[in-house]
C-alpha cells in the first residue's frame, strides 16, 4: 500500500494532508490541549480523527472545520464520533470563528494544520483572538521558530510581531516526520498560543500595525529609514527613540506598536 494511503484514505497533496499516527505524540498533544466542557472546543482539519477521537471522548461536543468532503463524510458516519461532532464543511481561511462563541464560553482551538496554509490561517485566527482562550497547533517546525523568535534573529519577521502582539507563544514539543503518514519532508512542532486578555502593548489600530510590518519586512536587508520613509520622518524616529539605521528584524514588538500608534496619531 502506498505511504500516502492511511485508513483507506489517500492523502491529497493540494490539501497538504499528512496524518498523525504516533500515539505517544497524540497523547502529549491532547494533554496540552486539555479538553473540557467549559470552553467551545474547535478542531481545524480533523483529517482521519487522530486528535478528534481522544478529544471528543473527553467532552460532550466538539466542533470541527474540514475542507475535504470525503473526510467530512467519514466523520458523519463514524460510529463513535458522529453524535459528538458539530461539523462545518468548508475552508478555515474563510470561516467566521466568532459564530461558534457561546455566552460565557471562549474557544479552545487546535489542529494538525495543513502546512501550505498555516501562515495565512494564523493571521486569520488572530482576528478572533478576543474570543479564543487557547490555540494548539501542529506546524512546520520552521513556522514555530518564526512564531517564537526574538528580535535580532533570522526567524524574526512579520508573523513573529503579529503573533506576539496578540498572544503569548509557547513551543510545546517537536515531532519527527516518521510520526505521520505519509511522512512530511520537514520537521514539525506543536505550539501553544495564549491570546492576551490585556495586550502588553495596545495598538490604536491593528490594521495600521499589520500594514507597517508588511512594509518594514518587505525588504529585510534594508534599514527602517529606507523601508518606512513614506510613513515616518527622521524626527519621528528620533521622537520614538528608535534607531532608523536598524533593520526590521532588530525592532521589538513594543517598538513596532509605538511606530504604528504614531502613524495612527498622524492620521487622526
Swiss-Prot record:
GO terms for molecular function: 16S rRNA (adenine(1518)-N(6)/adenine(1519)-N(6))-dimethyltransferase activity; RNA binding; rRNA (adenine-N6,N6-)-dimethyltransferase activity. The keyword rRNA processing applies. The keyword Cytoplasm applies. Keywords: Cytoplasm, Methyltransferase, RNA-binding, rRNA processing, S-adenosyl-L-methionine, Transferase. Its main location: cytoplasm. It catalyses: adenosine(1518)/adenosine(1519) in 16S rRNA + 4 S-adenosyl-L-methionine = N(6)-dimethyladenosine(1518)/N(6)-dimethyladenosine(1519) in 16S rRNA + 4 S-adenosyl-L-homocysteine + 4 H(+). GO terms for biological process: rRNA methylation. It is found in: Cytoplasm. S-adenosyl-L-methionine binds at residues 18, 20, 45, 66, 91, 112. Its EC number is 2.1.1.182. One of its GO terms (cellular component) is cytosol. It comes from the Bacteria. Specifically dimethylates two adjacent adenosines (A1518 and A1519) in the loop of a conserved hairpin near the 3'-end of 16S rRNA in the 30S particle. May play a critical role in biogenesis of 30S subunits. Belongs to the class I-like SAM-binding methyltransferase superfamily. rRNA adenine N(6)-methyltransferase family. RsmA subfamily. NCBIfam families: ksgA. This is Ribosomal RNA small subunit methyltransferase A. It comes from Shewanella oneidensis (strain ATCC 700550 / JCM 31522 / CIP 106686 / LMG 19005 / NCIMB 14063 / MR-1).
Amino acid at each position: 500500500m502506498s505511504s500516502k494511503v492511511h485508513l483507506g484514505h489517500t492523502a491529497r497533496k493540494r490539501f497538504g494532508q499528512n496524518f498523525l499516527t504516533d500515539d505517544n505524540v497524540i497523547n502529549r498533544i491532547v494533554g496540552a490541549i486539555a479538553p473540557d466542557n467549559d470552553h467551545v472546543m474547535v478542531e481545524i482539519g480533523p483529517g482521519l480523527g487522530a486528535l478528534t477521537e481522544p478529544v471528543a471522548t473527553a467532552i460532550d461536543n466538539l466542533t470541527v472545520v474540514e475542507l475535504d468532503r470525503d473526510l467530512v463524510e467519514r466523520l458523519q458516519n463514524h460510529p463513535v464520533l458522529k453524535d459528538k461532532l458539530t461539523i462545518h464543511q468548508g475552508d478555515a481561511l474563510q470561516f467566521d470563528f466568532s459564530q461558534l462563541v457561546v455566552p460565557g464560553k471562549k474557544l479552545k482551538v487546535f489542529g494538525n494544520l495543513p502546512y501550505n496554509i498555516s501562515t495565512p490561517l494564523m493571521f486569520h485566527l488572530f482576528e478572533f483572538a478576543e474570543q479564543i482562550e487557547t490555540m494548539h497547533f501542529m506546524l512546520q517546525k520552521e513556522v514555530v521558530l518564526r512564531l517564537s523568535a526574538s528580535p535580532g534573529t533570522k526567524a524574526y519577521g512579520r508573523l513573529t510581531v503579529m503573533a506576539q502582539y496578540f498572544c503569548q507563544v509557547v513551543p510545546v514539543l517537536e515531532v519527527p516526520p516518521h510520526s505521520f503518514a505519509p511522512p512530511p519532508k520537514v520537521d514539525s512542532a506543536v505550539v501553544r498560543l495564549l491570546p492576551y486578555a490585556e495586550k502588553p502593548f495596545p495598538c490604536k489600530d491593528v490594521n495600521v500595525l499589520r500594514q507597517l510590518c508588511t512594509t518594514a519586512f518587505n525588504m529585510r536587508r534594508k534599514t527602517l529609514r529606507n523601508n518606512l520613509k513614506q510613513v515616518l520622518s527622521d524626527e519621528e524616529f528620533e521622537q520614538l527613540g528608535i534607531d532608523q539605521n536598524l533593520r526590521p528584524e532588530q525592532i521589538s514588538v513594543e517598538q513596532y506598536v509605538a511606530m504604528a500608534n504614531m502613524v495612527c496619531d498622524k492620521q487622526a
